[in-house]
Structures are given as C-alpha cells and as structure tokens.
Amino acid sequence: MTGFVLDPYVLDVLLPDLVGHDRSPSAFIVYVYLAHAAGSRGRVQVSYAAMASDTGLSKTCVQRAVAHLRRRKLVVATKATRTSVPDYRVTRPWVGRLPG
C-alpha cells in the first residue's frame, strides 16, 4: 500500500466548505477519491459505476457530486467521445494563491 498525502487545505477549508456550506458531503468524498486515484499524474479515467462501487455511494449520488465539483472548478472532466469514460483532472485552485 502506498501513502497518500492530503493537502492540509482540503481538510481545513474544503471539507467545511463542501460539507457545511454546500451541504454536499458526497462531493468531498468524490474529490478525495479522485485525488487519491489520480496520484502524482493528476488525472484518472474512471466511470461513475466504478466510483460508486469504490466509494459506497450510489451512481446518481456520484453523478451529482461530480457535477458539483465541476461547477466549483475542482475537477475538469473530458471525454474522447460522448460515450467514453471521462478522464478527470483534479485541480487545486488554492495553490499559488495562498500567502506563505
């Protein structure tokens, strides 16, 4: 098993924002899942069904969470064709904007 380092911003700011303010704990779960799956590459190709199975969320819940993350510009999803599995790029918009 390899280690996974989570940016402190994710727990300190993003968690309360997505769960508390946006009332979307599933979006937080999916963000962390995608960040882990993307690893150092920063991108991962995964289906809604696989995300649902891996996170324990329903497929509909995962679809809503991904839509929420896309609106918040926390993930970028691209597809080669309409029916292909999306390629997700996990973004960290706070990097470079925070002092220190």
Give, region by region, the residue ranges found by the protein language model.
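Winged-helix/helix-turn-helix nucleic-acid-interaction surface
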Residues: 59, 63-100
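Short recognition helix of helix-turn-helix/winged-helix DNA-binding domains
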Residues: 1-53, 60-61, 83
